[in-house]
Design a protein with these regions (language model features):
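Fungal secretory targeting signals
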Residues: 1-21
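Catalytic cores of phosphodiester-bond hydrolases, prominently lipid phosphodiesterases
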Residues: 14-51, 60, 68-75, 82-313
Length: 313
C-alpha cells in the first residue's frame, strides 16, 4: 500500500523534468561538434527523408516548388510549361506566368543543386557518382512530369534542350537502341501536349511519354511498353468512376474491375499506373481511395495535400 501510495503521489505531481532531458555534459559535446569537420555529413541535405510513392500534383502551385515535395519524400514532381519567345515558363495557366518562374529557375537548377550535393567530389570514389536526390535510397529515381501546354512539337523540342544541364552530368534515365534502359537519378516524362511521335520512335533518348492508362489497348498504343512509358496516367473519375460513398469498400464491383484491368494491362508491359483527379473530399473517401490504389498496385499516388499523404505512410 505504501508503494502504491508513493506511485499515486508521483503521478499527481506530474513528470520529473529531469526525465528525458539531455545531460549538460552531452549538450556541451553536441554544441561543440556542430559544424565540426569531424562530424560533418557531406550528403546530409536529405539524409532523414524517406521516399514515398507519391506524385506532387500541380507542384508548381506550392510556395517552394520541388523542394516542398522533396521535403515530404515525394518521388514524383510536375511542371506545366509554356513556351514564349524561346523561354519555358511554369504555371497552371497563362495568367499565372511571371518572368521569373521558369522551368530552369524552379526545377532544372534546384534539381541540379540537390544532385550536386548528393554527389560531392570525394577521395574515396574512383569515378563520379550518380546518386539520386534521397540519401536514404540513392538509387530511387525522381519522376519529373513535364506537362506541355503550348504547341507540342515546338515546346517539347525546347524541353529537350532545357534538360541539357542534367544530361551532360549523366543524371537522366536513358534509352539506348530502343530497348536498353539505364536508370538515372531523374526520369523525365512528357505529358499534356507532348507529341507521341517525338518520343516513341526515338531509339536513343533521355525522356519518356506519359501514355493514357485507360487507352493502352487502343491500336495507337499497342506497342507501348515501359521503354516508352514507365508510367501511364488517366483521369480516375473518367476511367474508374465517381465516388458516391465514403464506406469500405469504396469502389463498386464494376469500378474495381475497371481499375484492376487497367493496372494489369499496364503492368504486363512493364508500365506503372497513376491516377489523377482522385477525390480530395470527404477525407475518409480520399483515404479509402488511396488505400485501394496502393493495394491494387499503382506506382504513384496523386496528391495535393502532401502533409496528409506523408502522414498516411
Amino acid at each position: 500500500m505504501l508503494f502504491l501510495a508513493s506511485v499515486v503521489v508521483a503521478l499527481l505531481a506530474g513528470p520529473d523534468p529531469a526525465i528525458g532531458a539531455i545531460p549538460s555534459s552531452l549538450q556541451s559535446i553536441l554544441k561543440n561538434t556542430h559544424g565540426s569537420t569531424d562530424y560533418g555529413y557531406p550528403t546530409d541535405l536529405t539524409r532523414d527523408l524517406l521516399p514515398i510513392p507519391v506524385h506532387s500534383h500541380n507542384d508548381y502551385w506550392r510556395d517552394e516548388p520541388f523542394y516542398t515535395g522533396l521535403s515530404h519524400g515525394c518521388t514524383s514532381t510536375e511542371a506545366d510549361v509554356w513556351l514564349f519567345n524561346g523561354t519555358l515558363y511554369v504555371g497552371h495557366d497563362e495568367s499565372a506566368l511571371t518572368e521569373s518562374r521558369t522551368l530552369e529557375s524552379l526545377y532544372i537548377n534546384p534539381i541540379l543543386d540537390v544532385l550536386k550535393r548528393q554527389n560531392p567530389e570525394s577521395l574515396f570514389v574512383s569515378s563520379p557518382t550518380k546518386n539520386g536526390v534521397w540519401d536514404t535510397v540513392p538509387d530511387q529515381t525522381l519522376y519529373f512530369f513535364i506537362d506541355v501546354k503550348t504547341s507540342g512539337p515546338e515546346t517539347f523540342k525546347a524541353v529537350i534542350a532545357a534538360l541539357e544541364p542534367l544530361r551532360e552530368r549523366g543524371y537522366l534515365t536513358t534509352v539506348k537502341d530502343g530497348k536498353n534502359v539505364t536508370n538515372g537519378p531523374v526520369t523525365v516524362i512528357g505529358t499534356g501536349e507532348t507529341p507521341f511521335d517525338m518520343v516513341a520512335p526515338i531509339k536513343d533518348r533521355d525522356y519518356f511519354f506519359d501514355a493514357p492508362l485507360a487507352d493502352l489497348n487502343d491500336p495507337k498504343y499497342a506497342d507501348v511498353t515501359g521503354v516508352i512509358s514507365p508510367v501511364a496516367s488517366t483521369d480516375f473519375q473518367e476511367a474508374v468512376g465517381k465516388i458516391t460513398v465514403d464506406t469500405d469498400p469504396i469502389l463498386s464491383d464494376d469500378q474495381l474491375k475497371a481499375l484492376r484491368d487497367q493496372i494489369a494491362t499496364a503492368n504486363e508491359r512493364g508500365i506503372g499506373a497513376r491516377y489523377w483527379n482522385t477525390p480530395y473530399f470527404p477525407i475518409r473517401a480520399r483515404n479509402l481511395v488511396w488505400r485501394t490504389l496502393l493495394r491494387e498496385g499503382v506506382i504513384l499516388l496523386n496528391a495535393d495535400d502532401l502533409a496528409a499523404v506523408a502522414s498516411y505512410f
